[in-house]
Swiss-Prot record:
Function of the protein: Involved in targeting and insertion of nascent membrane proteins into the cytoplasmic membrane. Acts as a receptor for the complex formed by the signal recognition particle (SRP) and the ribosome-nascent chain (RNC). Interaction with SRP-RNC leads to the transfer of the RNC complex to the Sec translocase for insertion into the membrane, the hydrolysis of GTP by both Ffh and FtsY, and the dissociation of the SRP-FtsY complex into the individual components.
This protein's name: Signal recognition particle receptor FtsY
Domain of life: Bacteria
Region spans: Disordered: 1-31
Residues the entry annotates as binding GTP: 228-235, 309-313, 373-376
Gene3D superfamilies xrefs: Apolipoprotein, P-loop containing nucleotide triphosphate hydrolases, Signal recognition particle SRP54, nucleotide-binding domain
Catalytic activity: GTP + H2O = GDP + phosphate + H(+)
Gene Ontology biological-process annotations: SRP-dependent cotranslational protein targeting to membrane
């Protein structure tokens, strides 16, 4: 009996264990399935989340790209507009420059034409003014330039003509040597060829006298003191110089320093009214005081140029020469570097005596320039050659007529052409 029960129990145990195993397996399978399901759900959720984030990121990037595209497009549009505007401005600038340059060229051409016309007009007046000197020389030189063979007789005849034309011995000797050298150098044979040789020799001699007055760029008045003998044309030259400087855009003030002659003061005042220029004068007092007051007035008024007249005097009048030295000293007190220019006015009619005058005034004052007047009324045009040879003080201006425009800067070439052509 006992063995029966024991065998039965042994048979029940494996069945129970198998059932438990199956139950455990089923439970494990269920749990595994649940885990897998959970994992699957988590994976799907994660995938969905990632997908959403990716789509959001893509959308954000796409928006940014669009914004960049729009910004770039806007910048390109603005750049194109700026380029078009710049191109328009460049074209406008080109047109403006072309117009300005065209106007400037036109003005320059007009100025050149006016200058050439003026030169021609002055050359004609100069030639007309030197008629007496030219006619005298032409008549005397007719035999020299008549076509004969160049020999010693011809040279002697030429030398005589030069001496009688007031060129003086020193200038004549210089010219004769120069002409001989040119004849020898160029192999000239005929008297007709002497004219060119003489013209070039005379030009080379008087060319150093051609030193136009150049006004400095300064805010201080430029003081010009004029001296000379009575009747040389100082006062008239001052009036013409005032007009000449005004034409250059300069303001001018006149000092009536010829206190010896009431007529001189009145004449200068008439020139002042004619040119609308202030004249400083005194009914009493000396020349130095008038000139001092004139410089002070010019400094106060911002005047560019002071033209100071002085009384006429002969170099032999020693007390008057001392007086004009005083005028110079007083001008230096009024302005340390004044007078900036000291000019003697010469009457061309006095011929060789002009050289002596220049020497005397130069020794007394230290001349910086000359004005040679009345060349139209004399046959002594050779005086410039004498001056060039003996005392070569620069000839600032020459006068060949009574007109207000008949006082001009000295041009050596124009003078020689007018004298010998």
């Amino acid at each position: 009996m006992f063995s029966f029960f024991r065998r039965k129990k042994k048979q029940e145990t494996p069945a129970l264990e198998e059932a438990q195993i199956q139950e455990t397996a089923a439970k494990a399978e269920s749990e595994t399935a649940q885990v897998i399901e959970n994992i699957k759900e988590d994976a799907e959720s994660l995938a969905e989340s990632v997908k959403g984030q990716v789509e959001s990121a893509v959308e954000t990037v796409s928006g940014a790209v669009e914004q960049v595209k729009e910004a770039v497009a806007e910048m390109l549009s603005e750049a194109e507009e700026a380029a078009e505007k710049a191109a328009e401005q460049v074209e406008a600038a080109k047109e403006a420059i072309a117009e300005t340059v065209g106007e400037a060229v036109g003005q320059v051409q007009e100025a050149v034409a006016t200058t050439e016309e003026h030169k021609l007009g002055w050359a004609a007046r100069l030639k007309q003014g030197l008629t007496k000197s030219r006619d005298k020389m032409a008549k005397s030189l007719a035999g020299v330039f008549g076509g004969g063979q160049i020999d010693e007789d011809l040279y002697e005849e030429l030398e005589t003509v030069l001496i009688t034309s007031d060129m003086g011995m020193e200038a004549t000797e210089y010219l004769m040597k120069d002409v001989r050298d040119r004849v020898s150098l160029k192999g000239l044979k005929d008297g007709n060829e002497l004219r060119g040789a003489l013209k070039e020799a005379l030009y080379d001699l008087i060319k150093p006298l051609e030193k136009p007055l150049v006004l400095p760029e300064t805010k201080e008045p430029f003081v010009i003191m004029l001296a000379g003998i009575n009747g040389a044309g100082k006062t008239t030259s001052i009036g013409k110089l005032a007009k000449y400087f005004q034409a250059q855009g300069k303001s001018v003030l006149l000092a009536a320093g010829d206190t010896f002659r009431a007529a001189a003061r009145e004449q200068l005042q008439a020139w002042g009214e004619r040119n609308n220029v202030t004249v400083i004068s005194q009914t009493t007092g000396d020349s130095a005081a008038v000139c001092f007051d004139a410089v002070q007035a010019a400094k106060a008024r911002g005047i560019d140029i002071v033209l100071a007249d002085t009384a006429g005097r002969l170099p032999t009048q020693l007390h008057l020469m001392e007086e004009i030295k005083k005028v110079k000293r007083v001008l230096q007190k009024a302005m340390p570097d004044a007078p900036h220019e000291i000019i003697v006015v010469l009457d061309a009619n006095i011929g060789q005596n002009a050289v002596n005058q220049v020497k005397a005034f130069d020794d007394a004052l230290g001349l910086t320039g000359l004005i040679v007047t009345k060349l139209d009324g004399t046959a002594k045009g050779g005086i410039l050659a004498a001056l060039a040879s003996d005392r070569p003080v620069p000839v600032r201006y020459i006068g060949v007529g009574e007109g207000i425009d008949d006082l001009r800067p000295f041009d050596a070439r124009a003078f020689v052409d007018a004298l010998l052509d």
